[in-house]
Regions:
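Short, well-ordered alpha-helical segments enriched in acidic and aromatic residues
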Residues: 13-28
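A beta-strand edge to alpha-helix "cap/lid" segment located at domain peripheries
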Residues: 5, 12, 30-32, 36, ...
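Surface-exposed charged/polar residues within alpha-helices that form helix-capping/stabilizing sites
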Residues: 6-9, 21
Length: 106
């Protein structure tokens, strides 16, 4: 739970410099049909960290020296989604990240 707790704490409380230290130099983010490099992703995450955004219902699914998998809930345009994030780790840092959103039907 060490890395999971770290990510939740930094995303909810900052500072952004902590997140930067967790992101590998070779980092790539895959989202639906797009891809971001380290600088692009950190820029987007910086906006979240510096706003009042918070993880909602973060849930750890798996964590070991190779992978960190968790999900959380987001509301977008009045619809509720479960976002699952799969982080492949290299040298103790997030190296590849992929997310998937699943609509939650009440």
């Amino acid at each position: 739970m060490e890395k999971f707790n770290f990510v939740v704490d930094v995303m909810n409380n900052g500072p952004m410099e902590k997140m930067e230290s967790f992101v590998h130099e070779e980092f790539l983010f895959f989202k639906e049909y797009g891809m971001q490099d380290r600088d692009e992703w950190l820029s987007e995450i910086r906006e979240l960290v510096e706003s009042d955004w918070q993880f909602t219902e973060p849930n750890l699914l798996a964590e070991n020296e190779d992978v960190l998998v968790f999900n959380h809930i987001v509301v977008d345009d009045g619809q509720k989604f479960r976002v699952t994030a799969v982080n492949f780790l290299k040298d103790g840092q997030t190296w590849r990240l992929s997310t998937h959103r699943t609509l939650i039907k009440d």
